[in-house]
Amino acid sequence: MKFKFGVDSFIWAEDFKEKDLWIIEKAKEIGFEVVDFAIANPYTFPTEQVKAELARVGMDCVCTTTLTLETNPISPDEEIRKAAVAAMKKCVDICNTLGSPILGGVNY
């Protein structure tokens, strides 16, 4: 296995949006091989645009996310637990689309 050196998008953008696509090329320019996308909101993350930019620039990625009070999988509120499962499924879909081999982060 080849070790790759990466950078987290969170150092530039707390909630990655389409306007932040420049980060991918910037990461490549300064010597990184991988971008770790901190997915703050899987419903607004620009998946297709990120996929295209990664391909254009020639970068790999991994993904992370952080669950919130509204997406807490151990909440006593059933609707919040359902929202947690839906958000995690959406994050997994994003990972699959982008080719990320992992989904890390604060997922508990």
Please annotate each region the language model reported.
Residues 1-100:
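N-terminal pre-domain/capping segments
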Residues 106-108:
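Active-site-proximal loop/short-helix segments
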